C-alpha cells in the first residue's frame, strides 16, 4: 500500500520544477494524490477500515491546503497541475 521508492522517484521526475527539486508544491501535491488514490482503492476493498479512512481524510485535507496555496501563488500552475492530475473535474 505504501509508495515504493521507485514510484516516488517517477513522480518527482514528472512534476519537479528543476533538477534537484523534491519538495515543491507541485511534487507534494502529486505525491499526496498518488497516496490518496492507493488508499481509496484499499478502502473500497476494506469498507470497515475506519482508521485508514481517517488517514485518507487527513491526506485530502493536506492536499486541499496545498492546492489553495498554489492557487494563490500561481493560478496558471494550479490549473495546469489539476488538469494533469485529473482532480477537481
From Swiss-Prot:
Record-linked SUPFAM superfamilies: S15/NS1 RNA-binding domain
GO biological process terms on file: translation
Function, in words: One of the primary rRNA binding proteins, it binds directly to 16S rRNA where it helps nucleate assembly of the platform of the 30S subunit by binding and bridging several RNA helices of the 16S rRNA.
GO molecular function: rRNA binding; structural constituent of ribosome
Gene of this entry: rpsO
GO cellular component: cytosolic small ribosomal subunit
Name of the protein in question: Small ribosomal subunit protein uS15
Secretion signal span: none
UniProtKB keywords: Ribonucleoprotein, Ribosomal protein, RNA-binding, rRNA-binding
UniProt record similarity statement: Belongs to the universal ribosomal protein uS15 family.
